[in-house]
Amino acid sequence: MKSVFLCEQADNISRVYAQSTVSLLKAEAALEAKVYTKRDLTKTPESFKETEYIFSSWGMPVLTADEISAYFPQLKCVFYAAGSVQSFARPFLERGIKVFSAWAANAVPVAEYTAAQIILANKGFFKAAQKMSGGDVPAAREAFNHYSGNYGAKVGIIGAGMIGKLVIQALKNHRLEILVSDPFLTDKTAGELCVKKCGLDELFRSCTVVSNHLANNGQTRGMLDYALFSSMPPYGVFINTGRGAQVVESGLARALERRPDLTALLDVTDPEPPESGSPFYSLENCILTPHIAGSSGNEVHRMAEYISDEFLRFKKGLPCRYEVTLKMLETMA
């Protein structure tokens, strides 16, 4: 067999790979429809000696370098129809096997979701809706009056990777002043994006809405703390669709308790979901969602389409767009 599906959760393969994509890969990559697991590798290791390409999605098993050498001596590439490859990619890359990810495809719905929240946040939607739904019409109107709308509002973007850039692009038709904190953002790219570079202190102090898109690694863990949250302007809104580990959650909870004017929109936490008894469940100014920003429903088909297109580009010797390198693992989510 030349290509195989390898995934611990077969349902994810059938959900992400539309039948049209599977048919294309059967024809172009000699892909077998069966979904194999790590257990299959150990039971019949000889079956994979000729495999050149692995296709996967959420549930890709973690393999050591020795296991990769033993099971897949002819392997050239892993095509991953999902976002982060941090959990499994390094041993493949260290053996010279190329890894491609649909991180760019998964970034699209996250950026759409975030941009929508930013627009609503600047209109005072979350505070006003909460008061209005509780039957307090005067309080709803009073809350709404504290927000200046989107015209000329300052929005802070933390991290200008793929998602951060897409959020900025999604907001380009609105007259917003966008500040970005990202040590890897060059002056040239900032100019092209029409954004202002700044540090975290200035960003939190200046922006009515702040959205986190930091890469998830040891360097960013606990980077967003009480001092930053408590410095936000009156009626500021913090949006997190990145990772919960980047937030000192006790500090955020304390800021929300002491500053009821603030609002936090948390699609991610650490742990996820929050533990029983977490103040996030009881704080009126904290809105939790169950990690819904990323690809869902029919949106997941986009990831497999990106990956199948990437395979065709590789096969034809064309430049590939979504290859992940060891260097990229240092800064990618």
Where are these regions (language model features)?
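An N-terminal-biased, well-structured beta-alpha scaffold segment characteristic
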Residues: 1-100
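Rossmann-like adenosine-cofactor binding region
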Residues: 62-63, 185-279
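Phosphate-coordination loops involved in phosphoryl transfer and adenosine-cofactor binding
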Residues: 75, 151-154, 226, 235
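Rossmann-like dinucleotide-binding domain for NAD(H)/NADP(H)
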Residues: 99, 234-333
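Phosphate-binding beta-alpha-beta segment of Rossmann-like dinucleotide-binding domains, i.e.
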Residues: 102-154, 169
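Glycine-rich Rossmann-fold phosphate-binding loop(s) that bind the pyrophosphate
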Residues: 160-161
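N-terminal Rossmann-fold NAD(P) dinucleotide-binding loop
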Residues: 164-165
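NAD(P)-binding Rossmann-fold cofactor-contacting core
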Residues: 173-191
